[in-house]
Amino acid sequence: MTTPSETMEERIRRAEVLVEALPYIRRFSGHTLVIKLGGAAMGEDLDAFLQDVVLLRFVGMRPVLVHGGGPEISLWQKRLGLEPRFVNGLRVTDGPTMDVVKMVLTGKIGPELVARIHTLGGQAVGMSGEDGPTLMVRPRGTEGGHDLGFVGEVDQVNAEPVEAVLDQGRIPVIASIGLGVDGDAYNVNADTVAAELAVALRATKLVLLTDVEGVRGADGELVSVLDAATADRLIESGAISGGMIPKVRAALRALDAVTASHIIDGRVSHSLLLELLTEKGVGTMVTR
């Protein structure tokens, strides 16, 4: 269906977009893609992103969605009289803070994402790394002399619960919480969770959505393709810093399984499709 004001050139361009995507759809059909949605990227274009995820499922791909929720967790901490504290970018997670993490990720953000996917025509199942359990973790312990509390590092991934959801034709929506051997829940970096899941699932792609264009080099320009050696140099020089460091390290870790990792700007409408189904892409592709 076209609109009365739509020109023939615009209609032809729509068809050309579909034709351009066809080789990529053929290449990735039946393949697993792990996509991490950060809290900072959950903005006005969230529905456009979720439409992309639903479309990928409909054309035969197997998307897995991992979500964080840092800004929302901090917001609820403050509402409940708890002061957010960070050490080297890691949230200090005492008992009350862990309760907030679980409440926000599994009681608010996860269900909202699942509901939006259903509204957009897809089928999704909300999960936590505790379910199955999917993510077995160990306490991270201290950072810079500070006790991080219930912050975990992934020890083992059980991919079976996620694969079962994928085999049903549904989209797993996974909160970045893991289960410790002590039976306690732990807060785990969502980039790390996505990378470890990508390896365990033998995924073809890992995509990390963030709120910047991608990785920038020493000259401040966007790096379209980043290899491991260059990434190490940029981290050592300080060109890659702050929250981008764990993203790049996660992207590199996933290369044990995936053909390429991608760090893209979640604020750009349909950035996921642009990165995966067009020749040029819109972010940084990380390769060996």
Describe every region a protein language model picked out.
Residues 273:
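Conserved N-terminal glycine/acidic-rich loop preference
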Residues 1-267, 276, 280, 287-288:
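Nucleotide/pyrophosphate-binding catalytic subdomain
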